[in-house]
A protein has these predicted regions:
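Active-site metal-binding loops of divalent metal-dependent hydrolases
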Residues: 33, 63-64, 114-116, 135-137, ...
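Cap/insert and terminal regions of metallo-dependent hydrolase folds
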Residues: 2-13, 127-204
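Short, well-ordered, mixed-charge alpha-helical segments that flank or form enzyme active sites
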Residues: 35-39, 67-69
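Short beta-strand scaffold segments in enzyme catalytic cores
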Residues: 119-124
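Metal-dependent catalytic neighborhoods of phosphoester/phosphodiester hydrolases
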Residues: 38-48, 190-191
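Metallo-beta-lactamase
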Residues: 3-20, 24-36, 52-111, 159-166, ...
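Short polar/acidic secondary-structure junctions
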Residues: 101, 113-114, 125-126
Length: 204
């Protein structure tokens, strides 16, 4: 969708305000490769797209990469594969991974298909606490009340439903902080079972 592509938000300025420069980033973890999730993978320099984080490893599901490559000509992803992914691959900065993949002692990437074939979730462990980044496995908090509801963008609706329930049940079992990308503020929530659905306790 054009509304999610080539936007001029002060993202790098916000990163700098947090004390991080692009050259200091070690990893870029990709839940999936839709254009609204890969916009800062590259930036324009002298009329061409170059990696925004020149010293980082961009970790991408191989299944997701293959799916995006096969549909590169589709109009619904705004040329993101050509402009946002291939410059990273051509620079030798991509790590294509299969199945569960760990990074150090704190990060674990696990398959979470449905929204796209190679969509993943990312667990961040910090001592006794942990959080779960779920990408586009959910788009709205209403999906806690109605976990079988999909967005119109889920490529495999049945798998998306099963994945969503699995991720929510994981958060309940391990008291993991749910970290969705599309809810808006306050962004993070604990999850409780509520009958056949789920309730959220959003963080202040």
């Amino acid at each position: 969708l054009p509304a999610y592509h080539m936007q001029e938000f002060p993202w790098l300025d916000n990163l700098a305000a947090a004390g991080v420069q692009p050259e200091e980033v070690d990893y870029v973890l990709c839940t999936h490769l839709h254009s609204d999730h890969v916009g800062w993978h590259t930036r324009l320099q002298d009329g061409r797209h170059v990696p925004t984080f020149p010293n980082a490893r961009y970790v991408i599901s191989k299944t997701e990469y293959d799916n995006a490559a096969a549909s590169e000509g589709a109009d619904d992803n705004n040329g993101a594969f050509l402009n946002r992914i291939m410059p990273v691959v051509d620079a030798g900065l991509s790590d294509l991974v299969d199945g569960e993949h760990g990074i150090g002692d704190s990060l674990v990437i696990t398959p979470a298909p449905g929204h796209t074939p190679g969509h993943v979730a990312i667990t961040l462990n910090s001592g006794e606490d942990n959080g779960l980044f779920i990408g586009d496995a959910m788009h709205s908090a209403i999906q806690g009340v109605f976990p079988d509801w999909n967005s119109g963008f889920c490529q495999d609706p049945d798998t998306a439903r099963a994945t969503r329930r699995r991720l929510l049940e994981h958060c309940c079992e391990y008291n993991a902080l749910l970290l969705p990308q599309h809810f808006g503020k306050p962004f993070a929530t604990r999850v409780r079972p509520q009958g056949d659905a789920f309730a959220f306790d959003f963080m202040p």
